[in-house]
Swiss-Prot record:
Assembly, per entry: Part of the 30S ribosomal subunit. Contacts proteins S8 and S17. May interact with IF1 in the 30S initiation complex.
One annotated GO molecular function: tRNA binding
The protein's name in its UniProt record: Small ribosomal subunit protein uS12
InterPro entries, sorted: NA-bd_OB-fold, Ribosomal_uS12, Ribosomal_uS12_bac
Gene Ontology biological process: translation
Cited function: With S4 and S5 plays an important role in translational accuracy. Interacts with and stabilizes bases of the 16S rRNA that are involved in tRNA selection in the A site and with the mRNA backbone. Located at the interface of the 30S and 50S subunits, it traverses the body of the 30S subunit contacting proteins on the other side and probably holding the rRNA structure together. The combined cluster of proteins S8, S12 and S17 appears to hold together the shoulder and platform of the 30S subunit.
Any one GO CC term of the record: small ribosomal subunit
Family label: Belongs to the universal ribosomal protein uS12 family.
Keywords: Methylation, Ribonucleoprotein, Ribosomal protein, RNA-binding, rRNA-binding, tRNA-binding
Length: 124
């Protein structure tokens, strides 16, 4: 416990929160170009082929981002929008591609949770 005199001399240190998405530089989303689109396998208890893309952002930083949903149309040189949000079983993947914006198509035949996958409302 510091004395009053110690607090007067030095004050309290502000604890600085480390950001989980440093490449976004405080922005909610960023645009980028796909450098490589590939699949990778998740960590130990899980098994799958997760679709990911290496994206070079407009600020020059290159990040790995996850492509959510079933099926995608992304390839090299596709322009995508990314947001923050990690994938727990893929180490080093801290960003998500936003479906339904720029070159990324929304998920077709999606009925629930459509807004997260850029899917239009199905006609009756």
């Amino acid at each position: 416990m510091p004395t009053i005199n110690q607090l007067v001399r030095q004050g309290r240190k502000k604890s600085v929160k480390k950001t989980n998405t440093p490449a976004l530089k405080g922005c909610p989303q960023k645009r980028g170009v796909c450098v490589r689109v590939y699949t990778t396998t998740p960590k130990k208890p899980n098994s799958a082929l997760r679709k990911v893309a290496r994206v070079r952002l407009t600020n020059g930083i290159e990040v790995t981002s996850y492509i959510p949903g079933i099926g995608h149309n992304l390839q090299e040189h596709s322009v995508v929008m990314i947001r923050g949000g990690r994938v727990k079983d893929l180490p080093g993947v801290r960003y998500h591609v936003i479906r339904g914006t720029l070159d990324t198509l929304g998920v077709s035949d999606r009925r629930q949770g459509r807004s997260k996958y850029g899917a239009k409302k199905p006609s009756k």
